């Protein structure tokens, strides 16, 4: 790490911008999901015709939106934490909790998901897995690939936040939340 935290800041800023860009693109999935749900409901109740592929598409779109929303939430600090306790702690204690939370919980969990997710995707690809439902969606490996990819992005976002938190502890000592907000890219 550099003595002034500049290298960490550049890396963190790059990852933040990437996460915000991907999160912005993926956010349109919610509009598409809404359209698919409305179409499926109209087909089912107005025309008595259920479409398996639309139902499966709903599940897949929701999964993609949720999975890629994790890194966006971490980048924008909009994830859930125990604020009742968190707000009572000193900025330095919050920074240490953030640092150890990322190191001991978030990064190992991301590593496990990627480690076990990649063979899951490869197996699906190798056998040409398709939906078991008649009329279901093909290329099941594609939706399964969103799991390790999204968790790789989440891990990169966590590392960026970890570096920023570490830099705050070493050089400036504000809370990581304050430092995070002051270094956030101005446009998504």
Features from the language model and the residues they span:
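Alpha-helical transmembrane segments and membrane-interface helix-loop junctions
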Residues: 1-173, 177
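Positively charged, low-complexity/disordered segments
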Residues: 175-178, 182-188
